[in-house]
Amino acid sequence: MQNKIPHVIVCDDDAELNSFMRNHFKLDGYETHQALSAQECIDKLAELGDTIDAITVDGKIASDRSIMLIVNVRRMNKNVKVFVLADKGLSEDKVRMMDYGADEFTVKPISMESIINKVNLQLLEAARSAVAS
């Protein structure tokens, strides 16, 4: 987030919710990108590469697909922040997602303000770490 517009991919198969989330990120100064499936998310990340700073992933995308998405994202871009937004908070799901590389696992309902704050915080911490290195 070093004086550049942060880019986020919103990966949610609900088109209305995806649009709603992207609009809120835009209002907070983000450049947003839509993905309605795990494959679209991978394709978008392949297209945009290191310009992507964060990805929000809907936990409704089957757990195994979400895990494979996270694994593939990590292979493509180790620095992107991955946020899983789940409908339920089973501890084993959270542990698995975090073990495979998710940066945050949050259970819905959660306000957009809270989601954006979590993303902002992770990006700020990453920028500070990059400066300190």
Protein language model annotation of sequence segments:
Residues 40, 62, 88-92:
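Negatively charged, flexible loop motifs adjacent to catalytic sites
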Residues 68, 89-105:
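Alpha4 helix (beta4-alpha4-beta5 surface) of REC/receiver domains from two-component response regulators
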Residues 34-54:
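Acidic, metal-coordinating helix/loop segments flanking the phosphotransfer/catalytic sites
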Residues 15-34:
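Two-component/phosphorelay signaling modules centered on CheY-like receiver
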Residues 52, 56-73:
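Conserved phosphotransfer microenvironments
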Residues 92, 110-119, 127:
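C-terminal output helix
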Residues 46-50, 73-79, 100, 121:
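Conserved phosphotransfer cores of two-component systems
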